[in-house]
Amino acid sequence: VLGSPLTCDFACISLSDLLTPWEKIEQRLRGAAAGDFCIVLYNPSSKKRTDHLRRACDILLEIVPPETVCGLVRSIGREGENCTLTTLGELRDTQVDMLTTVFVGNSRTRVMDGRMVTPRGYRGV
């Protein structure tokens, strides 16, 4: 849908603090950012948790540059599927819901032909 945002290693982190304390989520976000992982965020927002994506972006922005390529996909594999490319700096103020999956690129992620691509390291890519 987005292109090839995830290659090699990546982290998948839920932003729901119903079963995981927010402090643990913060620790995971910082670790993934420090390790230069591509990061997938799910459960980014709900009726009660409207600010978790903003808070997660603030944590990532402590380590990751604001121009980092990000992608949003709503309703993956369902009718009405929609994808958007943005940057981490812009993602902070983006409206999302529980049907949205957020992809944060790493230092090698680029937009190529309108797609989010994280190269595996081959020459010329």
PLM region spans:
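Class I SAM-dependent methyltransferase SAM-binding "motif I" and its flanking Rossmann-like core
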Residues: V1-C38
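A contiguous loop/helix-start segment that scaffolds small-molecule binding in enzyme catalytic cores
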Residues: A34-V125
